Amino acid sequence: HALPGVGQNLQDHIDYVQSWTVPSHTASFGASPRGIGQIARAMFEWRRQRSGMVTSTIATAGAFFRSAPEVAVPDLQLVFVVALVDDHARKAHLGHGISCHVDVLRPYSRGTVGIRSSNPRVAPVIDPQFLSDERDLALLVQGGQMQQRILESAAFDSVRGKMLYPVKSGDTAAMAQAIRNRADTQYHPVGTCKMGPDSDPLAVVDAQLRVKGIAGLRVADASIMPTLIGGNTN
């Protein structure tokens, strides 16, 4: 039974992170003698009182905003983190820092998910095709410039140190290249088994999540969303 929409229409929030170092005495998570001591004391506080530093989500604040006044609803999201975040924390750094994520909430780019083999233990081929639509890049450049203006404002002057990956916010070409080099998933994939009417050739399930043309089979996860929502899926 052929359903051409299976594995098509992949959408995800494309995410760009900028980070700055901060002194170790700040309320941030980091790899330093002082930071290790802070965590050790915080663990005891948590065990005794269920309070303190380790109750933090680390992603401590967020914001939704519009890239232009004429945009009807927010199209960019910021998430602030009290730690250095580099390549989803796969790249570790000594010291302390703060980071800010910016996401395109309603991306135009569409990717695919395919299979390599009939063996279910073989990993699938996932191609998000991030930034394949230039509108996403242009919007993320605006978001990157906004996040940089916020973190480089006077409110952070007393704690902000060096930028982990320096880029001039006013240099649009440099910001675009930095985004191409480092932007990645925010882990909100949807769309590869989209819900839709029979008239939609890429629809995989109906309004009751039943797979079209196959009796007794339903899909009940975020892959049935036809489009990505303007916020976290989890």
Regions found by a protein language model. Name each.
Residues 1-41, 53:
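Glycine-rich loop(s) and the adjacent beta-strand/alpha-helix scaffold that form part
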Residues 9, 232-234:
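Asparagine-centered polar/low-complexity signal
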Residues 22-26, 39-232:
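FAD-dependent oxidoreductase catalytic-site/capping-region signature
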